[in-house]
């Protein structure tokens, strides 16, 4: 655990600027990211996905076994009080969520191989990583496509699994390490 904790939620609100804008505010250690994930309704409100993140002292480790826990807004809102701008009220947006989930950013060291005999890992099982590039789900899709293409090319066998492993394991392990910051 590197000390980063994210809180995620969705809030019904008016989207800003183009209505499809992705906004990131803050620093690498204290930030908020938000963007709409729906079209505005008749009242002009869209579902806004948001992520609030801080990095704290990690010397004691993460003291909670949960990594996807529902929490009260008061648990973390104090980190974002005063983040009011003429075009967005960050504390108001965070408070507007029906549910908020806490995610300590925990990754795993890369493994030397994603394949063991006739078993292959893909997605987070192969390469759990910080969502620095917001690419976790996308990478799992890439894994599945590369694995599928290897099976089309080589058949459903160990040779296909080795092709998949040889294509992705080393370069994606490097991404895991880069995403640590």
Please report, for each region that a protein language model flagged, where it lies by residue:
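Conserved FAD-binding catalytic core of PHBH/FMO-like flavoproteins
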Residues: 1-87
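C-terminal helical "tail/cap" subdomain of flavin- and related membrane-associated enzymes
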Residues: 112, 132-135, 149-181
